[in-house]
Structures are given as structure tokens and as C-alpha cells.
Amino acid sequence: MTKETHENHLRTHNGIFPVSLLSTQARQLLNFKLKSPSYYLLNSFKLLVKSEGNNQSTTADVTLTKSPNAYHASSAREEKDLQVSRRDTCFYCSRKIIKCICNEEHVGIESVQLKLILLLCQNLPNVTTNAKKYFSSLADGHNFTLTLYKFSLDNQTFSQLLSRFKSFATLTELLQVHNVMLQVNFSFQARQLNTEIQLRRCHSLEKTWKFLFGDYELPDVLKDMESSNSDWSDTSLKRIAYLCSLVEELKLHSSIMNDKYVCLVSKHNNALEDKFNSEAARQLLQKSLSIVASNLKQAENKTISYEEKLSIAQNSINEIQTQNRDLKLETEKLQDQIKALLERNQSLQEALETVKNDEKNLREMNANYETEMKEARQKLNNKEALISHYDDDFRAKELKISRLSESLREKAGLLEFQSSVSEQRDLLYQEQIQSSIKDMENVFRKNEYLMEELNELKNNLEVESSKVLRLDEEMKCLKDEQLSQFDTVFSLTDERDGLQKDLKNTKGNLDDEIGRSAFLKSQIRDQELTIEKLHDSLETLSQTNNSLQCEISEKNAELNSVNSKLSEGRAHLETANKENEILKQQLELSESKLASLLNSYQSFINKKEHLYSFLQLVEPSFAKSDSSNATESQISESVRKGISIFNLLFIVYKNVCSQAGINPSTKLEDLDEHTLSDELTYITKKFVQKDQEYQTKEIELRNYKITLQSLLEDKLIGVNTDCRSPSCSDFEQLGQESENNTSISGRVSKLVKSFNDSSSISNNTKISITKSPSGEKVSVFKEMSDIALRDMDKNRKLLGENVDVRNIVVQKDESLNIDLQNNAVVPELHFKEGMVYDSLENAYTYLAESKRMLANELQMKQEDLEKVILELEAYKEIFLEEKQIPCEEFMPGKNAKSEKSLRSVFQEQLMRETKRVRKLEKVNSELKLHCFELSERLREREHTLQQTFGDK
């Protein structure tokens, strides 16, 4: 066969032998593209044995050769016995194959591990020691890396080649080798696939192959295939069914091949006895066989250890797959959380913008409030002047009342003197009556004069009867002069008694008024005590405000710590991003390295001609019984070429080790199965570790993002507020608007707008109140002033605190401007001991309620002030109506008027005094009621304050 025809033969059939030599099973196996890499090694082995035999004039290879006739006859018989209908469709794609049975277009298995070589060594126990040594050195030199060349023979042709050797054992051993080939090919395919479904599929296929060709039975395999939930296609099931049938056929043919093997061995032994009678050849053969046996034992030990390592690696791969599934589920959950956090973040940004707008409105309201305060101060000064004027009037009226009491005492003394005079007159009248009885004549004479006096007395009595009913009734009864005289005497006595009673009543009323004034003073003192208690409670409130400031400072420190943690999280995120970029670069480098490996593979294929020339030299040794025409120089050159090819493979092994970060062994002799298997497992583990690191870095990056957003979400709320003491109108508007607006941002903005320093009390009234006006009745002003001052201090403190918090928020907004735009962080608000508010809204509602209560109380105090002013005006009217009565008329030393005139004057004075006393009693009763109402209000206020602070 020439070189050109041989190349064409290889190009068309991808094999060294014609297709007619192959059986149907061989053709079917060729459809899998599962070719044995050991053909070249066997040829080199046979050549080596032949070269040794030529040097010693007897070789083991001569015994394995046949005559041409026997060779052709055996091949023809095998073809007749084993030929079955051809399968001309591809097993993988189910398409018809036109050009070749094993077209590379349909099946893309590019490589197989070199474990097959060692297994072949195990299954050839009778090979010479030198050949096996060379064989194992080549296998060790290639490691368990991927072989980068196409194979040319299938299992059947390989069995035909081995049938020419005495060292051929059984076909079952070759089937074991073929099983290993299938396992290796499927494991390599699993590494090349990317998606999870394909990985599972290849894993299950690999498992079924183990069951098919291992120690398991066939029905278990089918059960496992049916029970498994892997995504297998119809083509894969067809393949497995076909392979099962193929295994059965191979078992049948193995018995036939064993029979043929017995015949061949007998023939070969006869040929050996005829042609090799020399002792040198036998010794050489024994040495080679002993060496091969020792090497086979070592190879068996190595394969056992390697299989154990493979089982450990498969367990680790299964664990990694379960971990990957869990990680994918966790990543999906984290992505959902990230979406929810982003939505909440947007709502917080909107709330912060509304708060900033409210802050601008508050500044404008503060400016208006300052102008209103100036006007209110002027009004308060004017009212203070009026109150001082009323105070002076009140003092003047008190002096007048004292003078009146003195004048009344003097009048009482005069009335007593007049009563004594009237008694003396009564005695004189009695003497006159007795004298008149004795002296009737004189009486009749004087009767006319007396009648005139009686008429005058009647007129006077008629005037007096309109004022005093008793005197009118008694005066009507007087008809006669005597009776009139007696009646006058009795009426004067009655008048004296009535005047005495009236004096006693006036004294009692004055004493009652003094007691009432003392009672009022005691009530005013009680009010002052309650006001002092209120001051104490307000002082406790100020202390709580100080504690609030301390807590706010602590919260600011916590904010700083949170910000430091956030900065650390950002640094971790940056490092994670950098590491991800590095991993991506490493993946790109690995891809580039794979491309370079493919290039080296293609370059190695280009050097395949050396192998072809090597095989051409080997082929005549099988075709001819006599020694081949090849010279020793040609054989040595072909061997050198084969060795150079394997050296090239060793170079590829070094490149792979360098890319995987392993220090390769520099000598072929130093390579063991253990070291090579360890290096292979290390490469796979390193690749898996890199993949896991990349996935963990992605998960860490997502976790950092989630933690950052959760921290921001938990602490983000807009704090841009100013506090003031609102007026009642503001609170009423706020209540109406809060009912209409239900959104949180709207309510917060309305509350913020209501907190100005503008209140219903003007600044002037506050300043006048602080001056503590004189008098015990004006103690209400002290209470109002203290409340107003405390309220202003509270508002100032809260304003300062809100400004500090707002500055902190602005700084944090500038620093946290990565993913969240203009968000602010707020601590929890602490008011009073044991009162914690989770949000500004609750705090503002509490402040609004307290300020409403204070505003209502201030309005009540203003109403009380107006009432007091009205009472002062009533006192003024009373004292203006008062007229001082001249006491000269009642002096005993001067000529007094007549009794009638005196009576009329006294009656008028008594009527005026009674009217004044009644007015004073009314004013007194009103003051008592007012004081009682004030005390009840103060008690209610204390009760409400105790309830609110106790509950909180």
C-alpha cells in the first residue's frame, strides 16, 4: 500500500483497515465516535518487540504473525460470522451518514483521558517487560490530561489486532476497557456543558453507564431511568435502549470470540514451537513477561486508588450541586427584598421633599410671628398701665370704705344720744299730759296750737309712711291729741328699737364681710399653693427636656456609628465589585487559555503525518510471515518520531499544569499515577473553587446592598421641623385638616406648620405678667406668666434640637448619595421618663394636644381677667356714687333740727347704706363663686396632668 492510497484510505474511512474488516458491532460503536487511543501505543509496542527480536534473531512478535493466506482466511470467516445489517444513521443526531460511518460532523467527542492506557496494561498480563515498561512510561508521560488527537480504531478492530498476540486474554477484558472509554467520554462531555439541565442529564447518563458496565444489573438501571425526574429527551432514551441491546449482542459474540481465541492460541503456540527454538528468545520473552507482570500489579494498585479518589470527587460534586441550588433560592428571595426596599425608598424620598417645603413655610411664619410679637408687647404695656391705674383706684376705695365705717360708728353714737334725748322728751310729754288733765282749761286754750302741730306732724308722718310702713300705720291710728302724743311716744320708742336692730345688723354684715374677705384670702393662698405646684411640675418638665437633649445626643452618636457601618459596608461593596471584576478577568483569561489549548491541539493534528509514516512501517509485519523489508534505521526513525509526538503531548501537559497553577514534573520517569491523579483532582477542585468564589462574591454583594438599604429604610425619615406654641385657631384648623388628610406626609406637614411661636397671648401681656402685679387677687397673672415663659423655653429647646437633627441629616444625605437620593436618618424621640415615640408624628400629636390644653387655659385666664376688670369697674361706680354726709348736723353742741327732719335724714341715710351693703354682698358672692370656679379648674388641670404623665 502506497502512502497516497493509505492517506486516502484514512481520509475516507478514518481508520487503518478497510471497512470490510469491521463487524456490525464495530460499525455501530464507530457511530459513537468512541475510538481507542491505544492503537498507536500498540503499534509502537509491536515495533519495539520486533526491534528487540531482530537484534536477537528471535522475537515475540514473530510468533504473533501469520501467513497471508491464514490472515485473509480468518478475516473472511470473521466477516461472514459477525456481519449484520449495517446501521447507517448517527446515534446522536439520528441523521443518515452519507460519506462515512463515523463522520466527525455528527459526533463531537474531542478527547478521552489516558486512563485507557493503564487499563490496557492491566488487561495484557503476558506482554514482555521491555514493551510494558515503554508502554507505561508513555502513559505516565501523558498524565490524565485530555488527549488532543482523533482516534482511528474501534473496539472490534482493536480486538482483531490483539488476537495476533499471545498476550491477548479475553474479550470481556476489552469490554471493560471499552466501558472505561464510555465513562470517560461522558464525564468529559458533562464538563463541557453549561446549563443545569444538560449537567443533570449527563450526570444521569454517566450513572447509567456505570450501571450498565459495572457491577449492577440491567433491570435496576432501567428502573432508575424510569424513576428519575431528569430532563431526558427521546433520543437519549433510544440511545440507552440501543446500548442495552448492544451489550447483549457483545456478550453473545464474546463467547464466539473466546472459541476463536482458543484456536488462535493453539496455532500461535505451534508456530512458536516451530520458529522459536532458541533459548535466547525464550529468556528474553520471560524477562519481558516478568517486567510486564510487575508493571501490571503496580498499575492495578494505582487504578484502585484512583477509583477511590474519583468516588470522593463525585460525592463532593453532588454536595456542591445541592449548595448551588440553595444559593439560587436565597438569591431569588434577596432580589424580591431589594425590590421592596427600593419602593419604600422612593416613598421616603417623597416624604423628605414635603418636609423641606414645610421648613421653608415655617421660616416665613417665624418672621411674621416676630412682627406680631412686637405689636403684642405694645398692647401688653398698655394693659399693664391700666391694671396699675385700677390698682390705685382699688386702694382709694378701700380707704373710703374705712372712712365710711368710721362715719357709721360716729352716726351710731349720735343715734344713741338722740335716743336718750327722745326718752327725756317722752318724760316731759307725760308731765305735760298730767298737767293738761289737771288744767283742762289751759289745754283747751292750747288746743288750737297743738292741732296745728298735729297737722304738721300728720304731714310729716304721711311722708314718713311712704318710706316706713310701720310708722304710717301707727300715725293713722292717732285721732286725738292725746292718742297722737301717746302714739308719737310709742313710735319713737319703736323707731329707737328698729335703729338699734339695724345697727346690730350692719355690724353683723360688716363682720360677715370681714370673714368673707378672710375666706377669700385663704382661697387665694390655696390658689397660690396650687400655682407653686404647677411651677414644680413645669420644672420637672424642663428636667425631662434636658434628659431628652441627652438622649438626642446619644442618638446622634448612634447615628454616627450607623454611618460608620454604612461606610464600611460601602467599602465592602467596592471590594466585592473589584473582586468580581478580577474574577471576570480570570474567566476571560481562562477562555483565552482554552483557545490557546485548542490552537495547540490543531497544531498537534497537523503533525499527525509522523504517525501515519510510523503506521506504514508497522503494517507489513502483520501482513507477511517473513521479516519485513524495513531496515533497523527506518524502524528507529519511526520510533523516534513516535517518541517526539509523545514529547509534544508532554509539553501540552506542562502548559495545562502551568495554566492551572501546578508545578509539573520535569521528567517522564518521575510521573506516577498518584501524582497525576492528585494534580487532576486539584485542577478540578481549583476550577470549582473559583466558580464558588465568584458565586459567593455575588451573594455577598447582594447581601451588602440589602443590608445598606435596610439600614437606610429603618432609619430614614424626614426631620425638618420647628416648634411653637400654637393658637386655638391654628389648632382648630389643624384638627379640621387632619380629618380631611389621611396621608402621613400631609399630617406631618400640617403639624409642622402649626408649630410657631405665635400664640393668642401677646408679648406685652407676657412681659406685664412677669412683673407680678401687686395684690393677692392678681395671682392668676403669675400663673399665666410662668406658663408662657416655660412654653417659650420649651419651644426654643425643641427648635434647637430640630436644627441639630436637621444638620445631621443634611450631612448624612451628602455622604449617602450612592443609591438613595436625598434621604435622612432620624433617631427615636424620647419625651418624659418612660415615654418613647417611634415617629415624629406621634411626638407632634402629643405636643399638639398639650399646647391645645395650654391655649384653652390661657383663654380661660383672659376671661377671668376681664371679669376682674368688670368687678373693679363696679367697685368704682359704687365709690363714685358715695357721698360723705356732714357730721355737723349730728353734733350735740349745736342747735339741732326738728325731730321730723332728723328722722327723715336718718331714714334716707339708712336706705342708702342698706343699698350699698346689698351691692357689696352681691359683689362678695360673685367673687366667692369666681374663686370656687378657679379652684375647681386648677384641680381638674392637676388631675389631667397626673393622668397624662402617669399613663405615659
Curated annotation (Swiss-Prot):
GO terms for cellular component: cytoplasm. Has a role in meiosis. One of its GO terms (biological process) is meiotic cell cycle. It comes from the Eukaryota. Keywords: Coiled coil, Cytoplasm, Meiosis. It is found in: Cytoplasm. It comes from Schizosaccharomyces pombe (strain 972 / ATCC 24843) (Fission yeast). This is Meiotic coiled-coil protein 3. Its main location: cytoplasm.
